[in-house]
Amino acid sequence: MPELPEVETVCRRLRPAVSGKTIQSVDVLDPKIIRGLDPEEWVHHLIGETITDVERRGKFILFKLTNGYLVSHLRMEGKFFPYETATEPVKHTHVVITFTDQSTLHYNDVRKFGTMELRTNETIHTTPPLSLLAYEPFDERVTTEALHRRLERMKTRAIKTALLDQSIFVGLGNIYVDETLFRAGVHPTRPAASLSREEVDRVRTEAVAVLNEAIERGGSTIRSYADPDGATGTFQERLYVYGQTGEPCRRCGHEIEKMKLGGRGTHYCPHCQQR
């Protein structure tokens, strides 16, 4: 699943490609993608709207319209591809947006798990899904003290599963939680409440650093992720533990191990991240 760095990269590529363009028509080839409205009504609301910006909130892509927002979540395999001219949809193309200049935006999704829905300016941040999200790691309101207070209430919850909770800390998925905890020197099974203030500060600091580095490198392509230009990310070349099971730790030489935690594959170095 694309995580925050990948979604941020997608937004940065889409912004210059679609901003300022007016929607002439929309073809919904698979109605399963559309949420909240009948597909015909959904299309009716979009025609004539101009995309004024492309924003991101957590892992959601927000197409800012003249009136409201088109909210998209890529889930496992969703991808957007802009084309300068009309282009035939391929097997896994599920939505085609045609603009008045005859350029198009295709949404492709092999797994069909992605979603699109409309929100008004008034409801975009006050109704699910965005209303359920916490602050992002970059937000100045995410202080060490505030995060420490939240984690102190989690007496039995592992720090790994706590950081994956988007109502606690938005934008960290499996890859970047594993990398954050490695860099912070915190074992993933530690109870969240057991972390000292200093450890929480390291986790917060490293989370921001990991995400910024991943964004700079276009995200991580582990399986099939590609941005709207078709380019793959390169941060996977910098991963210390994720996907490195059985390899020597680049810091200490100990073998990287993998376990299941909360149903998620979890990678760590037992020497650098002691319990």
Curated annotation (Swiss-Prot):
This protein's record includes keyword Transmembrane helix: no
Keywords: DNA damage, DNA repair, DNA-binding, Glycosidase, Hydrolase, Lyase, Metal-binding, Multifunctional enzyme, Zinc, Zinc-finger
Annotated catalytic residues: 2-3, 59, 264
Chain residues that bind DNA: 92, 111, 155
PROSITE patterns: FPG_CAT, ZF_FPG_1, ZF_FPG_2
Enzyme Commission code(s) on record: 3.2.2.23, 4.2.99.18
Cofactor binding annotation: Binds 1 zinc ion per subunit.
Reaction equations catalysed: Hydrolysis of DNA containing ring-opened 7-methylguanine residues, releasing 2,6-diamino-4-hydroxy-5-(N-methyl)formamidopyrimidine; 2'-deoxyribonucleotide-(2'-deoxyribose 5'-phosphate)-2'-deoxyribonucleotide-DNA = a 3'-end 2'-deoxyribonucleotide-(2,3-dehydro-2,3-deoxyribose 5'-phosphate)-DNA + a 5'-end 5'-phospho-2'-deoxyribonucleoside-DNA + H(+)
Record GO terms (molecular function): 8-oxo-7,8-dihydroguanine DNA N-glycosylase activity; class I DNA-(apurinic or apyrimidinic site) endonuclease activity; damaged DNA binding; zinc ion binding
Cofactor(s) required, per the database record: Zn(2+)
Zinc finger (FPG-type): 240-274
Coiled coil: none
A GO biological-process term: base-excision repair
Subunit structure as annotated in this protein's UniProt entry: Monomer.
Task of the protein: Involved in base excision repair of DNA damaged by oxidation or by mutagenic agents. Acts as a DNA glycosylase that recognizes and removes damaged bases. Has a preference for oxidized purines, such as 7,8-dihydro-8-oxoguanine (8-oxoG). Has AP (apurinic/apyrimidinic) lyase activity and introduces nicks in the DNA strand. Cleaves the DNA backbone by beta-delta elimination to generate a single-strand break at the site of the removed base with both 3'- and 5'-phosphates.
Family to which this protein belongs: Belongs to the FPG family.
NCBIfam families registered for this protein in UniProt: fpg, PRK01103.1
Protein name: Formamidopyrimidine-DNA glycosylase
Species of origin: Exiguobacterium sp. (strain ATCC BAA-1283 / AT1b)
